[in-house]
């Protein structure tokens, strides 16, 4: 097999070395010419895999190490008989960790009690569903809007987007980017909906940039709107709007899901799909390539404050403010310089682990055990 992989996909050799020759390119450089002699294509969300790129090529399998598939022309895949796989849920936990870090930062700036907020989660799939589980596990009030899932689960606890926007203090977006169809999500938060947000609302977008009208949001913030905003995704990536970023509390270069576990899990999942397509046995597993957790164990004093414990456990693993600082330093120079810096921050992103790898002792205190279990860490 002739395999072409995005150069930023990790451990490709570990999984695919015995399957043929492997060539690597920057994801944005993968085009029609690059696919002339390729059987298997492995990509991330930065590569548009379209009819124009694939027509006449020998590509027969496409794997994307991402949850979303809006960069894949699935209609053409079906027409051309091209097998494909995404990696659903691969980085979901990393995104949840990111959102928790943003909430902690917002609470610190606002002097707010996280337990007193009402959370609105828009999109309850792989990422949003896990976030809902964590927030409810902590005992917090959560409203969920997911029309496609509501249609499948009519007895589920769902609310309309209008009700969620009217009642939630915190809004976290986790929808795919659908430009048409029954439930389009492009500019789901458009200018009228953004303008109608309650004063003091916190908004987090770690889904796709165009789910929020970036220009409308910038105008709103420039006008002094009382909002706290965390954006990991941007319209026109890798060109992020520096004026919008300057008005966000947290601004990062599409790295919410960039945990080490998430990256390796994504490669493992497309390898599993590839083996199923080929009808061959899997020779490598995620556990073969995943290093030991970096924190062997944490001991909480049974008398500590549960809110402090929550913040400490989350920040022991990840604090998005470090990524925010690095991103802001990159938002200088001309547009070409900023685009290159955006991609460089993603390419050279430092390893980060997930909260689920923590092993935590609580001395038997029930309130602390609840925090540990809600976060998905291991209780010892």
Curated annotation (Swiss-Prot):
Organism this protein belongs to: Pseudomonas aeruginosa (strain LESB58)
Function: Catalyzes the oxidation of erythronate-4-phosphate to 3-hydroxy-2-oxo-4-phosphonooxybutanoate.
Residues at which NAD(+) binds: 126-127, 146, 175, 206-208, 232, 257
SUPFAM superfamilies with a match to the protein in the record: Formate/glycerate dehydrogenase catalytic domain-like (SSF52283), NAD(P)-binding Rossmann-fold domains (SSF51735)
Any one GO cellular component localisation term in the record: cytosol
Main location group: cytoplasm
One function term, GO molecular function aspect: 4-phosphoerythronate dehydrogenase activity
Catalytic activity annotation: 4-phospho-D-erythronate + NAD(+) = (R)-3-hydroxy-2-oxo-4-phosphooxybutanoate + NADH + H(+)
GO biological process: 'de novo' pyridoxal 5'-phosphate biosynthetic process; pyridoxine biosynthetic process
Similarity comment: Belongs to the D-isomer specific 2-hydroxyacid dehydrogenase family. PdxB subfamily.
Assembly behavior: Homodimer.
InterPro entries hit by this protein: D-isomer_2_OHA_DH_cat_dom, D-isomer_DH_CS, D-isomer_DH_NAD-bd, Erythronate-4-P_DHase, Erythronate-4-P_DHase_dimer, NAD(P)-bd_dom_sf, PdxB_dimer_sf
EC number annotated for this UniProt entry: 1.1.1.290
EC class: oxidoreductase
Catalytic residues identified in the record: 208, 237, 254
Keywords, comma-separated and alphabetical: Cytoplasm, NAD, Oxidoreductase, Pyridoxine biosynthesis
Annotated metabolic or biological route of this protein: Cofactor biosynthesis; pyridoxine 5'-phosphate biosynthesis; pyridoxine 5'-phosphate from D-erythrose 4-phosphate: step 2/5
Protein name per its UniProtKB record: Erythronate-4-phosphate dehydrogenase
Pfam families the UniProt entry points to: 2-Hacid_dh (PF00389), 2-Hacid_dh_C (PF02826), DUF3410 (PF11890)
Protein localization: Cytoplasm
Binding site for substrate: 45, 66, 258
């Amino acid at each position: 097999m002739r395999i072409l992989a995005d150069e930023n996909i990790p451990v490709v050799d570990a999984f695919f070395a015995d399957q043929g020759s492997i060539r690597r390119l920057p994801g944005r450089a993968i085009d029609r010419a690059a696919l002339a002699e390729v059987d298997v294509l492995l990509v991330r969300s930065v590569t548009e895999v379209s009819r124009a790129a694939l027509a006449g090529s020998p590509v027969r399998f496409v794997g994307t190490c991402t949850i979303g598939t809006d960069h894949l022309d699935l209609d053409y895949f079906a027409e051309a008989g091209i097998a494909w796989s995404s990696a659903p849920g691969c980085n979901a936990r990393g995104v949840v960790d990111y959102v928790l870090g943003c909430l902690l930062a917002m609470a610190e700036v606002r002097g707010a009690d996280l337990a007193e907020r009402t959370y609105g989660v828009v999109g309850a799939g792989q990422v949003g569903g896990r976030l809902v589980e964590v927030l409810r596990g902590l005992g917090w009030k959560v409203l969920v809007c997911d029309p496609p899932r509501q249609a499948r689960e009519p007895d589920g606890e769902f609310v309309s987007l209008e009700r969620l926007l009217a009642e939630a203090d915190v809004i976290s977006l986790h929808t795919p980017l659908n430009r048409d169809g029954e439930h389009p999500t492009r500019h789901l938060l458009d200018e009228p909906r953004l303008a109608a947000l309650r004063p003091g609302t916190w908004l987090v977008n770690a889904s796709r940039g165009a789910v929020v009208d970036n220009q409308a949001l910038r105008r709103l913030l420039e006008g002094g709107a009382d909002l706290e905003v965390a954006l990991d995704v941007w319209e026109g990536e890798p060109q992020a709007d520096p004026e919008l970023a300057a008005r966000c509390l947290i601004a990062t270069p599409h790295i919410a899901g960039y945990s080490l576990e998430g990256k390796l899990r994504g490669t493992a999942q497309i390898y599993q799909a590839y083996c199923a397509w080929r009808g061959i046995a899997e020779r490598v597993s995620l556990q073969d390539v995943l290093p030991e957790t970096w924190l062997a164990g944490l001991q909480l004093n049974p008398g500590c404050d549960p809110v402090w414990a929550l913040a400490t456990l989350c920040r022991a693993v990840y604090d998005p403010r470090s990524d925010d600082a690095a991103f802001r330093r990159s938002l200088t120079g001309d547009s070409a310089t900023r685009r290159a810096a955006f991609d460089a921050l993603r390419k050279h992103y430092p390893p980060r682990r997930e909260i689920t790898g923590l092993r935590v002792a609580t001395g038997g205190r029930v309130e602390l055990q609840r925090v540990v279990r809600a976060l998905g860490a291991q209780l010892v």
